[in-house]
Amino acid sequence: LHLSLRRQRQMCKETDRIFCRHTPEHFLDVARLAYIFSLERGISCPRELIYCTALLHDIGRAEQYTVGTPHDEAGARIAETILSDLDFSSEEKEAILSAIREHRSSSDEVPVLSQLIYEADKKSRNCFLCVAEPECYWSPQKKNMTIQY
């Protein structure tokens, strides 16, 4: 595990958070769902790209909680450091960083990797089991009240 990733995880425990937490299980759920979506839709996107993006997409959460920087902005900056140590092409690195920056947007204008991560991020949540669901700020349309995947 990359040292920067480990350090971010330690800083972002979310022990007092009553809503969905950003855990390794969440990151892997997002990765698996995004990969399933790509296969179902016939989208040609390497699995490694999807998994790397999903594992890093919320890495800026600790900075958001402590400094107030939006986690997508902070995450892209932090991920850039991690990606410099990984064996991806410059185009692949830019695709990952772009998807991290844009993973909160449901727009059709963003690249397909961003769309996959956005949808998987939302679908990964089990709102139907959550005791905090009534207080959640998500709109009813975003909440997952049934099992789909």
Task: Set out the residue ranges of the language-model regions.
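Single conserved hydrophobic/aromatic residue that forms the stacking wall/gate
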Residues: 1-12
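Catalytic-site beta-strand/loop segments enriched in glycine and acidic/polar residues
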Residues: 52-61
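Divalent metal-dependent phosphate-bond-processing catalytic cores, especially two-metal-ion Mg2+/Mn2+ enzymes
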Residues: 14-47, 56, 65-90, 94-149
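Helix-centric, low-specificity signal for extended rod-like, repetitive segments
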Residues: 2-3, 50, 97
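Short coil-to-beta-strand
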Residues: 6-7, 47-52
